[in-house]
Amino acid sequence: MNYPHPIIAREGWPFIAIAAVIALLIHAVGGFGFAWPFWLLLVFVVQFFRDPQRPIPAQPNAVLCPADGRIVAVETTQDPYANREALKISVFMNVFNVHSQRSPVDGAVTKVEYFPGAFLNAAIDKASTENERNALVIQTASGKTVTAVQIAGLVARRILCYVRAGEPLSRGQRYGFIRFGSRVDVYLPLGSRAKVSIGEKVYASSTILAELEQ
């Protein structure tokens, strides 16, 4: 199933409008010779805020990737948001990736918690615990707990989350956005089988991160 939304993320509309107005004004005054860098900037802003539809795998026990990017961690560690030991899989997004976040599983949101913090390079490990972040804890119908954490980065300094505790989420459903480079950590129950490896390029909703133990 696909979840309809604008192909250009609504979070980017103000930025696109500002870039377009500036480019048009400079073009009107000085011509294309002066305006071309601003048209180029407009193209960059539009591509940054693109938010394409993605196919969603049908496997019921699959954990879907919540964001586009590259895998930077697959490890067993402590999940501080659900107070348990867990399998953590981390996705780093650079400024050229799509920056919307989508639910990795079907379930109910049991907790949403925001933490202020630093703005370190999101590709490094300590960004998980020291950077500004927003944690979403989801419980599936089978009782499994999946935690998805939006983490701000060196450039990204605005985390947006559109769900609250008690609300349902469907796999692949868009729930948040981080502007200009960031990271998402996913914590899974021990026994889950990772289906990705470090360095692998992944895509929101269409890449299977892991399989939950049945």
Swiss-Prot record:
Q: Its Gene Ontology molecular function terms?
A: phosphatidylserine decarboxylase activity
> What cofactors does this protein use?
pyruvate
Q: How does it sit in the membrane?
A: Peripheral membrane protein
Reaction catalysed by this enzyme: a 1,2-diacyl-sn-glycero-3-phospho-L-serine + H(+) = a 1,2-diacyl-sn-glycero-3-phosphoethanolamine + CO2
A GO-annotated cellular component: plasma membrane
Keyword annotations: Cell membrane, Decarboxylase, Lipid biosynthesis, Lipid metabolism, Lyase, Membrane, Phospholipid biosynthesis, Phospholipid metabolism, Pyruvate, Zymogen
Matches recorded under Pfam families? PS_Dcarbxylase
Per the record, the domain of life is Bacteria
After translation, the protein is modified as follows: Is synthesized initially as an inactive proenzyme. Formation of the active enzyme involves a self-maturation process in which the active site pyruvoyl group is generated from an internal serine residue via an autocatalytic post-translational modification. Two non-identical subunits are generated from the proenzyme in this reaction, and the pyruvate is formed at the N-terminus of the alpha chain, which is derived from the carboxyl end of the proenzyme.
Q: Which InterPro entries match?
A: PS_Dcarbxylase (IPR003817), PSD-A (IPR033175)
| The EC number(s) this enzyme carries | 4.1.1.65
* Listed pathway(s): Phospholipid metabolism; phosphatidylethanolamine biosynthesis; phosphatidylethanolamine from CDP-diacylglycerol: step 2/2
Per the record, the GO terms for biological process are: phosphatidylethanolamine biosynthetic process
Q: Where is this site: Cleavage (non-hydrolytic)?
A: G181, S182
Identify residues that carry Pyruvic acid (Ser).
S182
Catalytic site: S182
- What is the annotated localization of this protein? Cell membrane
Cofactor binding, per record: Binds 1 pyruvoyl group covalently per subunit.
Role this protein plays: Catalyzes the formation of phosphatidylethanolamine (PtdEtn) from phosphatidylserine (PtdSer).
- Summarize subunit and interaction data from the UniProt record for this chain: Heterodimer of a large membrane-associated beta subunit and a small pyruvoyl-containing alpha subunit.
What the entry lists under HAMAP family is as follows: PS_decarb_PSD_A
**What family is this protein classified in?**
Belongs to the phosphatidylserine decarboxylase family. PSD-A subfamily.
The name under which this protein is listed is Phosphatidylserine decarboxylase proenzyme
